[in-house]
């Protein structure tokens, strides 16, 4: 018996008496197809389905009809070409992101990145970026949280796709107030000039990665900054997308979450 077979048998014996637990709810994973999450938690993730806007992934309230560009993207086209999301910012996915982002449950980076990778493959199967770039935190916020959740997801995507991740390309050059509770215009004013690039680009395709997209203001500002320094096509990948009709409740929740981490 070789070493790999022996390890497999030992692991199987351990699993028999100590079944692997779900990283999110800690229940036995059972026959789940995911190596980290149980079937119950996987079933609680609400996928982003048609109809939605292919540019910003905004879900539409109507059931019928296909995907089409939303009114905001028609009137003010963003500097990114498309957006993909692992699911809606509701129920289990919302809880998972909260655990990952605010409770320090960093082991969720890989299962969440797998979900996002699957969504990316579905949205843009033939699109490969030259660089994966996470939305940065301001150094002050980074010192409070000690990690950038967008960077952790970006690294997992880069590892699985063999694509370089550049965490120093896009930086936040000034602190901003919390976005929660701000109107779209206030959000834009709050973030305008907050991001800069550390070097020029030469037409590289960029995948911009963030955790949650609410109004899309952050992605718009970042993509504009990337294009301003010579980036080629920019795509956006987020763990979750908020519904427009749920933004009011989302703002209230995010306000509380921001207070929990000290503003």
Which residue stretches match the model-derived regions?
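Glycine-rich phosphate/pyrophosphate-handling loop used in enzymes and phosphotransfer proteins
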Residues: 1-209, 214-263
């Amino acid at each position: 018996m070789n070493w790999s077979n022996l390890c497999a048998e030992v692991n199987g014996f351990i699993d028999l008496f100590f079944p692997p637990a779900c990283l999110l709810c800690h229940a036995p994973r059972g026959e789940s197809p995911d190596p980290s999450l149980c079937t119950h938690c996987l079933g609680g993730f609400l996928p982003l389905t048609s109809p939605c806007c292919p540019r910003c992934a905004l879900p539409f309230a109507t059931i019928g009809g296909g995907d089409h560009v939303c009114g905001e993207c028609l009137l003010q086209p963003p500097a990114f070409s498309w957006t993909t999301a692992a699911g809606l910012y509701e129920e289990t996915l919302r809880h998972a992101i909260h655990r990952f982002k605010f409770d320090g449950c960093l082991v969720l980076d890989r299962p969440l990145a797998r979900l996002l990778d699957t969504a990316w493959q579905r949205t843009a199967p033939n699109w490969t970026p030259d660089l994966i770039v996470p939305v940065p935190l301001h150094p002050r916020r980074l010192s409070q949280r000690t990690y950038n959740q967008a960077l952790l997801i970006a690294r997992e995507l880069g590892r699985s796709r063999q694509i370089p991740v550049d965490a120093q390309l896009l930086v936040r050059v000034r602190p901003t107030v919390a976005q929660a509770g701000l109107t779209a215009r206030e959000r834009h004013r709050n973030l305008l000039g907050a991001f800069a690039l550390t070097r020029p680009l030469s037409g590289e395709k960029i995948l911009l990665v963030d955790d949650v997209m609410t109004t899309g203001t952050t992605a718009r500002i970042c993509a504009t900054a990337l294009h301003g320094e010579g980036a080629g096509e920019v795509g956006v990948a987020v763990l979750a997308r908020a519904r427009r009709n749920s933004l009011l409740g989302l703002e209230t929740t995010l306000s509380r979450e921001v207070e929990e981490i000290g503003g």
